[in-house]
Amino acid sequence: MYLRFANRKPYEKLHLSTALEDWDMSEELKLSITADQYFAGADDKVERYTLRRQHSTELSPTRSEEGDFQECKFRPSLWLVVDPNLVIPCPEWINRIPPAPELTSPPLQLQRQLSVEYSTVEDSEDEAPTSCSDLMTDDDNDDSYNPCQPKNKHKRAKCLGKKMRVQKGLTELESWARPPLNYCNLISLALRNSEDGCLNVQQIYSFVRDHFPFFRIAPDGWKNTVRHNLCFSSSFEKSSGWVCADGHRRSCLWKLTRQGRRKFRNEMHALSDDLLHVLRRSMKKPALMELMFGM
């Protein structure tokens, strides 16, 4: 039985103490079920419980050979008050964080102190130089290195330098247009412009990056798409030759199939003038466009 109280302190002292000591245990022991299990409103089942009681008393060890009941010397107490948090502690209760200590200073004064501290930290972070000229000026004026000085200035400079490189890379990415070709056409272009018509995967990567600078800064996910097209497209097949890559690993060579050559030629001739203009802008050497694409 679990009891819930608004104020638990007076009842916490009752842990492991007995209650309801005037309960008639001699009558309780004669029952087949305890009184707390005999729910109210079950008068229709009284006869069945009475039969159980009679049967249990006939087999009771307290019954003597003459048929009279012996007085039971056992006087247990059925009601024991326990604190379940102490008897069976829950992990959440054990690992519960203790309450924070009460604040001695007034809340208004504490809020003012915190606001001053936060404003100081934010102002110190905003003091970092935001332009390249400011960064170069700070580095030029710092002629001597003092190990006693805090390193926040150097960390800011390093972070700003990295941020500027990322912005520069994004600018270069925007300056080069993405070629209006699918990955099968890019692979076919690389294979048909090789010396013997065969390349491994790394050589295909190098060809695409060299002639289309967009893929130099693009995320490396495009490489997975290239490998996927090599394995599952009917335009390519593995060659019988092998090449030793870096680390003396043998890498298989890929070549165009007859269907792949015909598909590439038809799709290139089907490009519109606008797409050809975008394709020329995306190439590092647009003068080689007619030679590379066979136009």
From Swiss-Prot:
<keyword id="KW-0804">Transcription</keyword>
<dbReference type="InterPro" id="IPR001766">
    <property type="entry name" value="Fork_head_dom"/>
</dbReference>
<dbReference type="InterPro" id="IPR036388">
    <property type="entry name" value="WH-like_DNA-bd_sf"/>
</dbReference>
<dbReference type="GO" id="GO:0005634">
    <property type="term" value="C:nucleus"/>
</dbReference>
<keyword id="KW-0238">DNA-binding</keyword>
<dbReference type="Pfam" id="PF00250">
    <property type="entry name" value="Forkhead"/>
</dbReference>
<keyword id="KW-0805">Transcription regulation</keyword>
<dbReference type="GO" id="GO:0003700">
    <property type="term" value="F:DNA-binding transcription factor activity"/>
</dbReference>
<dbReference type="InterPro" id="IPR036390">
    <property type="entry name" value="WH_DNA-bd_sf"/>
</dbReference>
<dbReference type="InterPro" id="IPR052328">
    <property type="entry name" value="FOX_transcription_regulators"/>
</dbReference>
<feature type="DNA-binding region" description="Fork-head">
    <location>
        <begin position="178"/>
        <end position="275"/>
    </location>
</feature>
<keyword id="KW-0539">Nucleus</keyword>
<protein>
    <recommendedName>
        <fullName>Forkhead box protein N5</fullName>
    </recommendedName>
</protein>
<dbReference type="GO" id="GO:1990837">
    <property type="term" value="F:sequence-specific double-stranded DNA binding"/>
</dbReference>
<feature type="region of interest" description="Disordered">
    <location>
        <begin position="119"/>
        <end position="146"/>
    </location>
</feature>
